[in-house]
Amino acid sequence: MTASLSIIGGYLGAGKTTLINALLRGALPGRTAVVVNDFGAVNIDADLIASADGDTISLTNGCICCQISTEMVDTLTALAARGDLEHIVCEVSGVGDPGRMARWRSFPGLTAGPLVVCVDGTSARRLLHDEYVGDVVRAQVAAAEVLLATKVDLATEAEVADAVAACLETAPSTPIHLGDAADPSTTLREIFAAEVPDIAPAPQAPGGPAAAADHAGLHSSTTVEYREPVDPERLAAHLAVLSGDLVRAKGTVLAADGIRYAVQLAGGRVEVRPHAAREAAGTTSAIVLIAAGPDAAAVAERAAAQLAALTREPARLAP
C-alpha cells in the first residue's frame, strides 16, 4: 500500500490541532499517520493510546502520531516503508509557510495528497488584513490547494460569509470547505480526496515542518510555568483581558482539585476545558503566550508578568 502525503497549515489558533485530533480518531478511511512538532500540543485522548515508543504514539484504532526529533527525511522514509498506511499528514508551524513544504509530497514511495490550510471562520478578514501578521496569513492562504474554514459553529452566517469572501480575495480559485464540528469525517474525506497539481521534486536537504520558513521576527513567545495549583477560571479571565495584545496562548494548568485543564486563547476567544488526561502526572502548570508586531517581545513579557502574579509563589518565566 502506498500512502498519500498531505500538508496542513494555518495561522496560530486556526484549528489545526482540532483537525489533527479528528484525523487521529479515524476521520479518514484506513490508517493515518500524523507528523507534528510536539506531542504535547496535540492533546491526544488517553483512552485512544495503545502504546508509546520514543517519537511514535500508536492508537487503538490503528492510527499513529509521530513527533519530529531528527530529520524529515528519516521520518518520511520510516513511514513510507511501513506499507500499512493510507494517509500521512504533516503539520506546519502556525507561523510557517506551508507552500515551502509542498515539494515533500513527491517523496519516494509516497503519493501526493492536498495542501490544506485552516482559516478561522470568526476572524479571517481581520487576520488577512492585520498590520503585523497579514502578510503571513495571506501567504498561507495563497499557498492552499484547499481551504478549511473552522469554528463556523461559533460564527454567525454573516461572519462565515465574510470569512469566505476575504479568503477568495486572496485565493479566488481555491475551493473552501466549511468545517462541521458535529460530523468532521464527511468534510475531511471530501477535502483529502481533492485533486492535486503536479508537484516539484522533494528536497534532499534536511529539515522538517519547523524548518518551513516561519516568520519568527514578527512573533515572540514567553512561557509562564506555575509551581502550585492555578485557578483556571481566574487565568481565563485574565487572558480575556489580554486578548487584544496576544495572538495566541495555549497550555495546561493543574487546579486545586487535582484536575488538569487545557486553557487556550485564539481569535480573541478564551476556552477552558478538562484536559484529555484529566489527572495527568506532575504538579506543574505552563502556558505559552505569543505576541506579534515590532514590540512583540515586550508585549509577551508584560502579559507573562501579569499572569505570573496569579499564584502566591511567583511563577517562572521562560523564553
Regions found by a protein language model. Give the residues of each.
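Nucleotide-state-sensitive switch-loop elements of NTP-binding domains
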Residues: T2-D135
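Conserved beta-strand/loop subsegment of P-loop NTPase cores
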Residues: A33-V34, V89, T111-D120, A139-V152, ...
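Short glycine-centered, acidic/aromatic-flanked micro-motifs in structured strand/loop junctions
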Residues: G10, A22, T150-K151, A291
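Alpha-helical scaffold elements adjacent to nucleotide-binding pockets in ATP/GTP-utilizing enzyme cores
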Residues: T75, R100-W104, Q140-A143, D162-A166
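Short amphipathic alpha-helical segments and helix-helix/interface helices
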Residues: L24, E91, A102, R138, ...
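Short glycine/proline-enriched loop/turn "hinge" motifs that connect secondary-structure elements
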Residues: G109, A139, A277-A281
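Helical mechanochemical/support elements of P-loop NTPase systems and associated helical scaffolds
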Residues: S4, I68-E71, D97, V133-Q140, ...
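C-terminal accessory "lid"/substrate-recognition subdomains
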Residues: V146, V152-A286, A291-P319
